[in-house]
Amino acid sequence: IKLILDGSPQGKTAYLTEPYYKPPHSESESYKGYPLIPQKEVSKWVSEYADLNIPIIAHANGDAAADMLITAVRNADLKTDHRTIMIHAQTVREDQLDQMKELKIIPSYFSTHTFYWGDWHRDSVFGEDRAMRISPTRSTLDRKMPFTVHNDAPVVPPDMIRLLWSTTNRITRS
């Protein structure tokens, strides 16, 4: 089962804990995106599917959306290694990686974000510091956590060589 918890960082609809660097024109300076599903529903679905031993895959780009999945998994009564997967995990923080490791949540990074939207993330979406942390594969490796990387076709072409290059080099188009 795939739950979609938020939107995209490049569209400024990912659900964040800190405001966007430059919010959309129609939003205030405190705009942080928004969840697509309330926490209560996320927790209910994770618990129900865990009881049925059905793995959960959750689209979570923003760190606030990641918090929602972490909370739901923590509160669920997971009797087995459930292999919950967090799709995209673009802005997960260090403390979230620690919790994900503890709860065995596997991140699957959309790591070509650095190539396709890195400049936009730096200059408009997150600012320099947060943009440098997009898809934190090094932090994940340092924790000896399993993770995967993926393209999100048709959002970007299904080019595995560019995906691996982007994951290791983290260079923008410019």
Predicted regions span which residues?
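Metal-coordinating catalytic core of metallo-dependent amide/deamination hydrolases
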Residues: 1-63, 99-106, 111-112, 164-166
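Short, contiguous strand/loop micro-motifs
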Residues: 31-33, 82-84, 122-125
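Residue-level marker of alpha-helix boundaries and capping positions
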Residues: 36, 87, 127-128
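Short, surface-exposed connector motifs at secondary-structure boundaries
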Residues: 48-57, 77-83, 143-147
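Catalytic beta/alpha-barrel core
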Residues: 57-61, 85-90
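Distinct, well-ordered alpha-helical segments
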Residues: 66-77
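Long amphipathic alpha-helical scaffold regions
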Residues: 76-85, 92-96
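Active-site-adjacent C-terminal substructures of enzyme catalytic domains
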Residues: 91-174
